[in-house]
Amino acid sequence: DQKGKSPESECNKISEEPKCNEDKICSWHKEVKAGEKHCKFNSTKAKEKGVAVTQTQTAGGTEATTDKCKGKLEDTCKKESNCKWEGETCKDSSILVNKQLALSVVSAAFAALLF
């Protein structure tokens, strides 16, 4: 039962390379900084093995990109590379690109599972 335990902490408990690499969500790192564990959580490996990976993303990251376009006048908005004028407001168009990129990554991972 892994409820309440982070995948990273579960991997950090493993101290032997073969056991770490056998785990569905962990990978062994030969060179680490002093005080760091060799066995670490690997989200790419976890996704490939079909393990559900919870995304730890803070809302602050998306707010920062949205705010850079907020409140700009139409002319200024249209000149900015990641902004677009929509209706009566200036909006961040990079969020849409990020969502499309995330969707294509998920689609590619799913297709890889089928073959």
Swiss-Prot record:
Gene3D superfamilies xrefs: 3.30.1680.30, 3.30.1680.40
Major site of localization recorded for this protein: membrane
Sorted UniProt keywords: Cell membrane, Glycoprotein, GPI-anchor, Lipoprotein, Membrane, Trypanosomiasis
Keyword Cell wall biogenesis/degradation: no
Residues modified by glycosylation: 42
Residues where lipid is bound covalently (GPI-anchor amidated aspartate): 92
Protein name per the record: Variant surface glycoprotein ANTAT 1.8
The species this protein was found in: Trypanosoma brucei brucei
